């Protein structure tokens, strides 16, 4: 019985006076939370940079595809043109040369 009392007293003293790691573990948990928040922000910034680079690359590829595609909505040779109806690439929108009574400009071949 004396042995049990001695162990109980020893257990009581060790739990009340003993140094617990609760404060240390709470501080470590807080530090880990702060570090994980910082690392998450850094990771997010890196992902945004990668995404921006990919979007730029995709945009450039789309522009190249558009450059190779057929030209749309352009006016042909000797057809009236204005700000709404543009001439095709190899044509230019000019006033008719010998006729002053035409009211609009026409698409002509570019002079070399």
UniProtKB/Swiss-Prot annotation:
<keyword id="KW-0964">Secreted</keyword>
<comment type="similarity">
    <text>Belongs to the neurotoxin 14 (magi-1) family. 08 (Ltx-4) subfamily.</text>
</comment>
<feature type="disulfide bond">
    <location>
        <begin position="87"/>
        <end position="107"/>
    </location>
</feature>
<feature type="disulfide bond">
    <location>
        <begin position="74"/>
        <end position="88"/>
    </location>
</feature>
<keyword id="KW-1015">Disulfide bond</keyword>
<dbReference type="GO" id="GO:0019871">
    <property type="term" value="F:sodium channel inhibitor activity"/>
</dbReference>
<keyword id="KW-0800">Toxin</keyword>
<feature type="signal peptide">
    <location>
        <begin position="1"/>
        <end position="18"/>
    </location>
</feature>
<comment type="function">
    <text>Probable ion channel inhibitor.</text>
</comment>
<feature type="propeptide">
    <location>
        <begin position="19"/>
        <end position="73"/>
    </location>
</feature>
<dbReference type="GO" id="GO:0090729">
    <property type="term" value="F:toxin activity"/>
</dbReference>
<dbReference type="GO" id="GO:0005576">
    <property type="term" value="C:extracellular region"/>
</dbReference>
<dbReference type="InterPro" id="IPR012627">
    <property type="entry name" value="Toxin_22"/>
</dbReference>
<keyword id="KW-0732">Signal</keyword>
<dbReference type="Pfam" id="PF08092">
    <property type="entry name" value="Toxin_22"/>
</dbReference>
<protein>
    <recommendedName>
        <fullName>U15-hexatoxin-Hi1a</fullName>
    </recommendedName>
</protein>
<keyword id="KW-0165">Cleavage on pair of basic residues</keyword>
<keyword id="KW-0872">Ion channel impairing toxin</keyword>
<feature type="disulfide bond">
    <location>
        <begin position="81"/>
        <end position="93"/>
    </location>
</feature>
């Amino acid at each position: 019985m004396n042995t049990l009392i001695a162990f109980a007293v020893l257990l009581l003293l060790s739990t009340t006076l003993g140094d617990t790691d609760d404060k240390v573990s709470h501080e470590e948990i807080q530090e880990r939370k702060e570090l994980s928040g910082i690392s998450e922000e850094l990771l997010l910034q890196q992902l945004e940079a990668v995404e921006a680079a990919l979007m730029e690359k995709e945009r450039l590829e789309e522009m190249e595809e558009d450059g190779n595609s057929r030209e749309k909505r352009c006016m042909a040779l000797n057809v009236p043109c204005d700000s709404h109806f543009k001439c095709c690439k190899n044509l230019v929108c000019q006033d008719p040369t010998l006729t002053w009574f035409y009211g609009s400009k026409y698409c002509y071949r570019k002079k070399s």
